[in-house]
Amino acid sequence: MPNRDTQSQNDTPRHSPEAAEPQRDSLFAAPIAKLGDWTFDEKVAEVFPDMIQRSVPGYSNIISMIGMLAERFVQPNSQIYDLGCSLGAATLSMRRNIKAEGCKIIAVDNSPAMVERCRRHIDAFRAETPVDVVEADILDIKLENASMVVLNFTLQFLEPANRQRLLNQVYQGLRPGGALVLSEKFSFADHNVGELLFNMHHDFKRANGYSELEISQKRSMLENVMLTDSVETHKNRLHQAGFEHAEVWFQCFNFGSLIALKAGEAQ
């Protein structure tokens, strides 16, 4: 079997349009007469890489650090889950960095458009660790033999009543010594802090080329489907699920990521 230390060299792009420069997001550049709720449809999937880079501060840092965390936490002969995988950025980052042998990544999303493009994106790169891309509701996935689970800006789109249930399932499916990475947009009890970080995020999007119209229309579409929680709420849920350790490891404005650890020695 090939040496895992050479995997980063093996995870190289094939000739594929999925590895090309992302298409620029201009979905909301013109006024939309009737704004519905946000959906991850074909139009969004087409511009998603550009959209998320220009909308989520620190996104590229989180993605690269997820790879480093995978190198540390992924155990031999285990499974890794990317729940709400979108186009597979976190999956690819983990696959580039996994050194343990006998592993498989299971990437799950409920958007047909995202899943189709994710499969093409994953297939555009060669690597040793196999990836299964699954179109499904993440609540219906039975997590087994997991050493690492990623929820990268996914939980906030789940009905609040189902969030504890999902975290319980993640904890039960993790091996001892396993890790969950939970990235989210945060809300804040302190109104002044929340308003400051909201405005800084607004400035970030403006600096990345979004107009006031684009920012406003996208926010209107998201407000009923992306419901954010405070860091304290996330920690309480994680502890209730059984995680012995949970802490924020990255934050930029009102976006950040927590890591939650299941106690015990890695197997």
Curated annotation (Swiss-Prot):
<comment type="function">
    <text>Catalyzes the conversion of S-adenosyl-L-methionine (SAM) to carboxy-S-adenosyl-L-methionine (Cx-SAM).</text>
</comment>
<dbReference type="Pfam" id="PF13649">
    <property type="entry name" value="Methyltransf_25"/>
</dbReference>
<feature type="compositionally biased region" description="Polar residues">
    <location>
        <begin position="1"/>
        <end position="11"/>
    </location>
</feature>
<dbReference type="InterPro" id="IPR029063">
    <property type="entry name" value="SAM-dependent_MTases_sf"/>
</dbReference>
<feature type="binding site">
    <location>
        <begin position="84"/>
        <end position="86"/>
    </location>
    <ligand>
        <name>S-adenosyl-L-methionine</name>
    </ligand>
</feature>
<dbReference type="GO" id="GO:1904047">
    <property type="term" value="F:S-adenosyl-L-methionine binding"/>
</dbReference>
<feature type="compositionally biased region" description="Basic and acidic residues">
    <location>
        <begin position="12"/>
        <end position="24"/>
    </location>
</feature>
<dbReference type="InterPro" id="IPR041698">
    <property type="entry name" value="Methyltransf_25"/>
</dbReference>
<comment type="similarity">
    <text>Belongs to the class I-like SAM-binding methyltransferase superfamily. Cx-SAM synthase family.</text>
</comment>
<dbReference type="InterPro" id="IPR005271">
    <property type="entry name" value="CmoA"/>
</dbReference>
<feature type="binding site">
    <location>
        <position position="59"/>
    </location>
    <ligand>
        <name>S-adenosyl-L-methionine</name>
    </ligand>
</feature>
<dbReference type="GO" id="GO:0002098">
    <property type="term" value="P:tRNA wobble uridine modification"/>
</dbReference>
<feature type="region of interest" description="Disordered">
    <location>
        <begin position="1"/>
        <end position="25"/>
    </location>
</feature>
<dbReference type="GO" id="GO:0016743">
    <property type="term" value="F:carboxyl- or carbamoyltransferase activity"/>
</dbReference>
<feature type="binding site">
    <location>
        <position position="219"/>
    </location>
    <ligand>
        <name>S-adenosyl-L-methionine</name>
    </ligand>
</feature>
<comment type="subunit">
    <text>Homodimer.</text>
</comment>
<feature type="binding site">
    <location>
        <begin position="137"/>
        <end position="138"/>
    </location>
    <ligand>
        <name>S-adenosyl-L-methionine</name>
    </ligand>
</feature>
<protein>
    <recommendedName>
        <fullName>Carboxy-S-adenosyl-L-methionine synthase</fullName>
        <ecNumber>2.1.3.-</ecNumber>
    </recommendedName>
</protein>
<keyword id="KW-0949">S-adenosyl-L-methionine</keyword>
<feature type="binding site">
    <location>
        <position position="152"/>
    </location>
    <ligand>
        <name>S-adenosyl-L-methionine</name>
    </ligand>
</feature>
<keyword id="KW-0808">Transferase</keyword>
<feature type="binding site">
    <location>
        <begin position="109"/>
        <end position="110"/>
    </location>
    <ligand>
        <name>S-adenosyl-L-methionine</name>
    </ligand>
</feature>
